[in-house]
Amino acid sequence: MASLYRQLLSNSYVTNISDEVSEIGARKTTNVTVNPGPFAQTGHAPVNWGHGELSDSTLVQPTLDGPYQPTTFNLPIDYWMLIAPTQIGRVAEGTNTTDRWFACVLVEPSVSNTQREYVLDGQTVQLQVSNDSSTLWKFILFIKLGKNGTYSQYSTLSTSNKLCAWMKREGRVYWYAGTTPNASDSYYLTINNDNSNVSCDAEFYLIPRSQTDLCAQYINNGLPPIQNTRNIVPVSISSREIRHTRAQMNEDIVVSKTSLWKEMQYNRDITIRFKFANSIVKSGGLGYKWSEISFKPMNYQYTYTRDGEEITAHTTCSVNGVNDFSYNGGTLPTDFAISRFEVIKENSYVYIDYWDDSQAFRNIVYVRSLSANLNDVICSGGDYSFALPVGAYPVMSGGAVTLSPAGVTLSTQFTDYVSLNSLRFRFRLAVSEPSFSISRTRLSGIYGLPAANPNNNVEYYEIAGRFSLISLVPTNDDYQTPIANSVTVRQDLERQLGELREEFNSLSQEIALSQLIDLATLPLDMFSMFSGIKSTVEAVKSMTTNIMKKFKTSNLANAISDLTNSMSDAASSISRSTSIRSVGSNTTMRISTAIQTGEDLKTMADASTQISNVSRSLRLREFTTQTDNLSFDDISAAVLKTKLDKSTQISQNTIPDIISESSEKFIPMRAYRVMDNDTAFETGIDGTFYAYRVDTFDEVPFDVEKFNKLITDSPVLSAIIDFKTLKNLNDNYGITKTQAMELLQSNPRTLKEFINNNNPIIRNRVENLIAQCRL
């Protein structure tokens, strides 16, 4: 069955000529001239564009205001005027009309001491200028103290960026001087701030004094790339004048208006209600193991009253930056264990996407001046009992976090029927009392909110506050701002994939083990793979082409392409002594006897990490070697085939994504072994590694040098039945050396015999592998 993935890999670079023609046609563009109109600030729609939410939960907001057209105006106090001239000569001048006149000129590189003619204050004057640098441009600040006085040179700024700046503050003019990238600001003259106008001959920007560090960065390093690479349309300084109106609690204000568009300011009270969702997955076997307890996005719809009007609202709650915990009560099948459970703490964030049916959200496409004020809320965890087949139930209880507002941006919510342009409120977390614990275990005193019962049986959490935004909307209230259709198409596909993933994961309980082993040994081709899916037989050819194109970009396909380098680098990275003891999952109990040579514990942990890296590469090594033995890819492909046949939601559009995801996500916890006569070497993705005798299953020192040689020269086998399971099987039932060798080599016939004989240990192991086939 693993031939399925081999087929996909070997054919993933085949593309139909029709696809090539379509792609070439899609790349053709047409140049269109657009009149930007009055909303041309920085050449974009009237919104402060930034890259928004980053993967590290950092919100970045641009602060550069401009560019503005050359003009004469009264420069606001405590604002840097950042000037960006494009040619030499007079750059700007200013005066308080009584006793201070100042002017700035730009001189190109390599100019010897010479006199040049400038028009300053309406008069033609001769000024002595020079620039000794062959690479830097030079700004020179001249000042005179009387109407008929003489200009004198006060300061210079040498720069490669052709940027200078000054600011009025506390009756003084501040100016950048020196040589970039070490230029700094200082003041040079005292003026009357109220009556000092500035005339600028170049485009300029305004930066508040609070962003002085940012202004210094621009002076020394240049403007951001977007200011240099886009066609920016400067606007008049008059567009900066905003009418100050007293905002009511809930009102709509027309900020500006043209024949087709208007800017509306919406002020709204808001009541946010949200809930957390979780996923609790129990492992296969005897019923004592849980594989995952995790947070999931949660949609919640509700109504509330705002100024006598009933509002229908929709929220989506999601989390970012979760912390993974685990608990392992022992190695026996009847020992309570949780492979992974998620907890949100100080390093986590909660996102709440909010939409309601009011006018404010009808055209929420082009938005600026977005702000919000919200209160804090405490989320407390409840009790969750782990129902064991026998014995008292362990109970996870406690845990609490406080959500505090940390920003707001635009977002899109995905519902079952429509996409909603909404507001995303971002909350940072602080842990609160009480801590959480699991009764009847040693796990206690941990702070944060676990995913087991995050809602504490309450109907919802509630946050109150208000928001304000300015939105560009059509002047005719009956029109709606257009949105690209492609967004909705991809969004519908994501919804279908989400439903399909949930169905796939729930089908694991319906797979018969004996039939699965038979299916895993069949060399099915691509046509047979999808023969059981309704409405796809006629489209198998085009569908498989789409699958191959999707598979071409998968992690597995990329990893296979550089198999040789990844294997040699990973194997040679194990800088350990000649002999070390095996390390199992319960390392802390055996650490004192783990290293035969007496090296420190840090070395052991380092070796475990390196072994984990090697184990990930061993899958690639096995993947490229065709054998008659069963592999993890055989089982995952068989599970995939079974679920495809049973699925009621599979379609031609979703199959490529499902196939690609299955190759990467099915059976994440794998182990591989190589054989050396009567000794087996076994390593796991989790960093565990063993060396043991085949006949007795007694552990022996792990010879790293021999292991490195074996993984290069010998076949790599999937440890379908891993060392712990084999040892448990031998201790409880006893197996012959022949059976041991066949199980070590993952012989499908022997595996099927044990399953048909209802051996609980082997069945539990295979059921665990099936449970790991999740998307």
Curated annotation (Swiss-Prot):
Short name of one Pfam family: VP4_haemagglut
Chain location of the short sequence motif DGE motif per the record: 307-309
Motif YGL motif: positions: 447-449
Entry annotated with the keyword Membrane: yes
Segments of this protein annotated with the region Hydrophobic: 388-408
Keyword Transmembrane recorded: no
Annotated spans, Spike foot: 509-775
GO CC terms in record: host cell endoplasmic reticulum-Golgi intermediate compartment; host cell plasma membrane; host cell rough endoplasmic reticulum; host cytoskeleton; membrane; viral outer capsid
Coiled coil segments of this chain: 483-510
Start and end residues of each stretch annotated as Spike head: 64-223
Disulfide bonds: 317-379
GO terms of biological process kind: permeabilization of host organelle membrane involved in viral entry into host cell; virion attachment to host cell
InterPro entries for the chain: ConA-like_dom_sf, Rota_A_VP4, Rota_VP4_MID, Rota_VP4_MID_sf, VP4_concanavalin-like, VP4_helical
Domain of life, source organism: Viruses
Annotated site location: Cleavage: 230-231, 240-241, 246-247
Region annotation (Spike body and stalk (antigen domain)) ranges: 247-478
Keywords noted in UniProt: Capsid protein, Coiled coil, Disulfide bond, Hemagglutinin, Host cell membrane, Host cytoplasm, Host cytoskeleton, Host endoplasmic reticulum, Host membrane, Host-virus interaction, Membrane, Outer capsid protein, Viral attachment to host cell, Viral penetration into host cytoplasm, Viral penetration via permeabilization of host membrane, Virion, Virus entry into host cell
Miscellaneous section: In group A rotaviruses, VP4 defines the P serotype. Some rotavirus strains are neuraminidase-sensitive and require sialic acid to attach to the cell surface. Some rotavirus strains are integrin-dependent. Some rotavirus strains depend on ganglioside for their entry into the host cell. Hsp70 also seems to be involved in the entry of some strains.
HAMAP family per UniProt: Rota_A_VP4, Rota_VP4
Similarity comment text for this entry: Belongs to the rotavirus VP4 family.
Name the record gives this protein: Outer capsid protein VP4
Upper classification of the organism: Viruses, Riboviria, Orthornavirae, Duplornaviricota, Resentoviricetes
